[in-house]
């Protein structure tokens, strides 16, 4: 929005041209989202406490979690508000990729909001009926997928980028829609499963979003895209602003979510952030990098799949409890140790992912 204001004011003072620089707007988007999140955080927490929107805890979970019962949840609303405000202020709103990203973010946030609200009002951890939850997640993902395909059909925006192989970039055709669906829905649920400890999900989300900001910038720059042997996608540069807004809002939320947490993001936050990472990965054509950089999310999801599959087939559990962060808790690891070690692993995986951009 302010891009247009800057363009208008340039005729009166050339210094306003600085607003046109993507790097400047990215930094300002990060700071705006951070400050908005820090500003509204205490207000949101107080409001959630007054409404008695407290977290419900699994009865079969670690005993250390019983003390978390009643901690305000649905704090993800402040993350979404900060990201949306910052993106609308600093992104070029004529860019369709910005709107696809906001559509998935807010659409998944709405589903998460309903899910959280049902858990709170029913005083259990069930929430939305699974089939309806996945139905609406699928509807939003498919609407976004068809729209993205319509814009990028038969261009580099619908090619598959394979790590380590610069010559292998097949045109996906309609398979692009299927891949987009699974990436968005899968990432959303993976982040949701990871959000089980104080700050566990938000820091990997911040790290991956920060990495995607760099990738989006390179993908939207014809010279860097050619240098890295990745597709040049003209609309992708504006995603830098969206990604840095996620970083800022995430860090602001972590201020209140760090152990011991004053507020939890709830499904309204985790589903939305996961969906946002998924749609960005698709738009910059780096789905494989998302698997690498978001390795913590992948492992958490696989631990649940393996646990359920093993129990159904062999009536035996692989882990003491799934997702895997609970397994380490039941082994005696203090919660902060689990959290920080997962953060370190996430940072390492993000760096590995960024390195693979050049290893082609």
Curated annotation (Swiss-Prot):
Q: Name one GO biological process term.
A: cell wall organization
**What's a GO cellular component annotated to this UniProt protein?**
plasma membrane
Q: List the disulfide bonds.
A: none
Q: Which Pfam families match?
A: Glycos_transf_4, MraY_sig1
The membrane-topology field of this record reads:
Multi-pass membrane protein
Q: Does the keyword Nucleotide-binding apply?
A: no
Q: Does the record bear Zinc in its keywords?
A: no
Instruction: Name the major location.
Output: membrane
Tell me which positions the record assigns to the signal sequence. none
Q: What is its EC number?
A: 2.7.8.13
Function (record text): Catalyzes the initial step of the lipid cycle reactions in the biosynthesis of the cell wall peptidoglycan: transfers peptidoglycan precursor phospho-MurNAc-pentapeptide from UDP-MurNAc-pentapeptide onto the lipid carrier undecaprenyl phosphate, yielding undecaprenyl-pyrophosphoryl-MurNAc-pentapeptide, known as lipid I.
Q: Which reaction does it catalyse?
A: UDP-N-acetyl-alpha-D-muramoyl-L-alanyl-gamma-D-glutamyl-meso-2,6-diaminopimeloyl-D-alanyl-D-alanine + di-trans,octa-cis-undecaprenyl phosphate = di-trans,octa-cis-undecaprenyl diphospho-N-acetyl-alpha-D-muramoyl-L-alanyl-D-glutamyl-meso-2,6-diaminopimeloyl-D-alanyl-D-alanine + UMP
Q: Where in the cell is it found?
A: Cell inner membrane
Q: Which NCBIfam families match?
A: mraY
Q: Which UniProt keywords apply?
A: Cell cycle, Cell division, Cell inner membrane, Cell membrane, Cell shape, Cell wall biogenesis/degradation, Magnesium, Membrane, Metal-binding, Peptidoglycan synthesis, Transferase, Transmembrane, Transmembrane helix
The gene name reads: mraY
| Protein family according to the UniProt entry | Belongs to the glycosyltransferase 4 family. MraY subfamily.
- Could you give a GO molecular-function term held by this entry? metal ion binding
Species assigned in the record:
Pasteurella multocida (strain Pm70)
Q: Which residues cross the membrane?
A: 21-41, 73-93, 94-114, 132-152, 168-188, 199-219, 235-255, 263-283, 288-308, 338-358
Protein name, per record:
Phospho-N-acetylmuramoyl-pentapeptide-transferase
Q: Which cofactor does it need?
A: Mg(2+)
Coiled-coil regions listed: none
Instruction: Say which enzyme class the record assigns.
Output: transferase
